[in-house]
C-alpha cells in the first residue's frame, strides 16, 4: 500500500482497538514513552504493558491484512519507530 493509503488504513484499524490498546499504541509511538512510563500512567506492570502492546500490534496487523497487502517496514516507519 502507498504511505497515504496505509496511514488511512492504520487510522481505521486504530479505531477498532479498545481505548486501552489505543492508548498504549499512542503513548508508545506518538508520545515516544518507554514501557515503564506507560506502566506508571496505566497503573500496571511493565510486563502487562508489553502484553497490551503485543496484542495491539497483532490486532493492527490482522486488521491491515484484511484491508490488503502492506509492508511491515512501512508500518513501523508510519508508527514512528523502525523496529
Residue ranges and their predicted role:
Residues 9, 32, 65-68:
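Glycine-centered secondary-structure boundary/capping sites
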Residues 28-30:
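Short amphipathic helical patch at the helix-1/turn junction of helix-turn-helix
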Residues 33-34, 75:
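Short linear sequence elements within intrinsically disordered, low-complexity coil regions
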Amino acid at each position: 500500500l502507498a504511505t497515504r493509503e496505509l496511514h488511512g488504513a492504520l487510522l481505521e484499524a486504530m479505531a477498532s482497538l479498545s481505548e486501552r490498546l489505543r492508548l498504549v499504541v499512542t503513548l508508545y509511538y506518538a508520545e515516544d514513552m518507554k514501557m515503564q512510563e506507560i506502566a506508571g500512567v496505566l497503573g500496571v506492570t511493565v510486563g502487562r504493558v508489553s502484553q497490551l502492546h503485543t496484542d495491539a500490534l497483532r490486532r493492527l496487523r490482522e486488521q491491515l491484512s484484511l484491508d490488503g497487502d502492506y509492508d511491515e517496514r512501512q508500518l513501523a516507519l508510519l508508527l514512528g519507530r523502525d523496529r
